[in-house]
């Protein structure tokens, strides 16, 4: 039996992780949960999975959750805020922590889990993008296992099983191309929030769906792959694969290319991260390549996806530039989801913020947190300057 602390239980990764736990009750149990604001769903999850500790976003939400659980005989101990999330990550009786919190909010709980010696099933790419220089040395020092949950990084991890050290030559990260992959580039100026949220293949949360439309999700994954697999940025490439069947590929020293294929279903990488090094049998529909028929690949269009260039630029620059890229993107996407900026303005906000930043050379945690705060404030300042914003 593997015991799990689940950070972000009411989000997309969290609910699918609980689907796995429900499907394999003899293998997995949830001992800790965190959720920011969806107390109704969290209450349902607590009644079903009976965690011992939970954390929520505020004192008011703790009171609301307690009211929803009135009379429940398995009332968990409750904590509040970021400190509460860190408590669940570090003190819930668990062998593995699933980090399903979206954005840089997952950084501190992830560090708390690492410092407590917990293995990580990492679904939060922003943790390594923003905090790679801080997180990875701690992971190595503590000797914890870091198992990727992102479908692309899980695919790479699976492809590398049994590959001798030093044999990895190149990583090819596949991207669906997002909601606007078939739109004329000149029409992107008219793209709405509703348009951006219509992902052609995957069912995901709003933020990552917008990131898919801008290809920022892939840019962040390039930086994450750099930290996970130790390759220079020149050896990590992005390829558009509209069918989302090949989840990523690796090229080895002898030019062999190994790929991992499957239907676009996040439950598979979640299950692999939880069960590794085993592979558990599933009742899920197997991949039928004859039914799929055709798999296509093409280079990404830099004019359509300017965020891709910004991600490589920030990754190569290092320091706190990736932190600023990530934080500025989170704020820009939030502004877009609130319909305060247009689709094409997001990349302009990111570029302007990166240009204004002065990076710390070898950042510590204070540098990372400071750069994160500065970038968010700078994007808000740019948006508030004027309706024209001199970015258009």
Swiss-Prot record:
Positions with a binding annotation for Mn(2+): 150, 152, 221
Residues holding NADPH: 10-13, 38, 124, 126, 205
Binding site for 1-deoxy-D-xylulose 5-phosphate: 125, 151-152, 176, 199, 212, 217-218, 221
InterPro entries: DXP_reductoisomerase (IPR003821), DXP_reductoisomerase_C (IPR013644), DXP_reductoisomerase_N (IPR013512), DXPR_C (IPR026877), DXPR_C_sf (IPR036169), NAD(P)-bd_dom_sf (IPR036291)
Pathways involved: Isoprenoid biosynthesis; isopentenyl diphosphate biosynthesis via DXP pathway; isopentenyl diphosphate from 1-deoxy-D-xylulose 5-phosphate: step 1/6
UniProt key word NADP: yes
EC number: 1.1.1.267
GO molecular function list: 1-deoxy-D-xylulose-5-phosphate reductoisomerase activity; manganese ion binding; NADPH binding
Catalysed transformations (reactions): 2-C-methyl-D-erythritol 4-phosphate + NADP(+) = 1-deoxy-D-xylulose 5-phosphate + NADPH + H(+)
Keywords recorded for this protein, A-Z: Isoprene biosynthesis, Manganese, Metal-binding, NADP, Oxidoreductase
GO biological process, any: isopentenyl diphosphate biosynthetic process, methylerythritol 4-phosphate pathway involved in terpenoid biosynthetic process
HAMAP family the record matches: DXP_reductoisom (MF_00183)
Protein family per UniProt: Belongs to the DXR family.
Database matches in PANTHER family: 1-DEOXY-D-XYLULOSE 5-PHOSPHATE REDUCTOISOMERASE (PTHR30525), 1-DEOXY-D-XYLULOSE 5-PHOSPHATE REDUCTOISOMERASE, CHLOROPLASTIC (PTHR30525:SF0)
Biological role stated in the UniProt entry: Catalyzes the NADPH-dependent rearrangement and reduction of 1-deoxy-D-xylulose-5-phosphate (DXP) to 2-C-methyl-D-erythritol 4-phosphate (MEP).
Name of this chain's protein: 1-deoxy-D-xylulose 5-phosphate reductoisomerase
Originating species: Gloeobacter violaceus (strain ATCC 29082 / PCC 7421)
């Amino acid at each position: 039996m593997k015991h799990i602390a689940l950070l972000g239980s009411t989000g997309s990764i969290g609910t699918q992780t609980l689907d796995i736990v429900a499907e394999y009750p003899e293998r997995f149990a949830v001992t800790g949960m965190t959720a920011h604001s969806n107390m109704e769903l969290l209450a349902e999850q607590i009644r079903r999975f009976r965690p011992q500790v939970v954390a929520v976003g505020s004192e008011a939400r703790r009171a609301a959750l307690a009211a929803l659980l009135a009379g429940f005989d398995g009332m968990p101990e409750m904590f509040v805020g970021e400190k509460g999330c860190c408590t669940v990550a570090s003190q819930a009786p668990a062998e593995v922590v699933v980090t399903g919190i979206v954005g840089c909010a997952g950084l501190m709980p992830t560090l708390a889990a690492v410092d407590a010696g917990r293995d990580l099933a990492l679904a939060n790419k922003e943790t390594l993008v923003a905090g790679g220089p801080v997180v990875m040395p701690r992971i190595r020092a503590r000797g914890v296992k870091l198992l990727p949950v992102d479908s692309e990084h899980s695919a790479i991890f699976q492809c590398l099983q049994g590959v001798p050290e030093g044999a990895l030559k190149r990583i090819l990260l596949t991207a669906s191309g997002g909601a606007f992959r078939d739109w004329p580039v000149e029409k992107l100026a008219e793209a709405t929030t509703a348009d951006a949220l219509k992902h052609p293949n995957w069912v995901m949360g709003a933020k990552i769906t917008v990131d898919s439309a801008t290809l920022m999700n892939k840019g962040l994954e390039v930086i994450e792959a750099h930290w996970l697999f130790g390759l220079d940025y020149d050896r990590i490439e992005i390829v558009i694969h509209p069918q989302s069947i090949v989840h990523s590929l690796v090229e080895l020293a002898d030019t062999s290319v190994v790929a991992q294929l499957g239907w676009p279903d996040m439950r598979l990488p979640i299950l692999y991260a939880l069960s590794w090094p085993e592979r558990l049998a599933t009742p899920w529909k197997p991949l039928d390549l004859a039914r799929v028929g055709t798999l296509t690949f093409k280079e990404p269009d830099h004019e359509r996806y300017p965020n891709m260039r910004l991600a490589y630029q920030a990754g190569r620059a290092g320091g706190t530039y990736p932190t600023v890229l990530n934080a500025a993107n989170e704020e820009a996407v939030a502004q877009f989801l609130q319909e305060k900026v247009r689709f094409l303005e997001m990349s302009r906000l990111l570029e302007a913020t990166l240009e204004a930043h002065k990076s710390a050379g070898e950042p510590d945690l204070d540098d990372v947190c400071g750069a994160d705060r500065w970038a968010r404030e700078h994007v808000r300042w740019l948006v508030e300057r004027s309706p024209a914003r001199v970015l258009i």
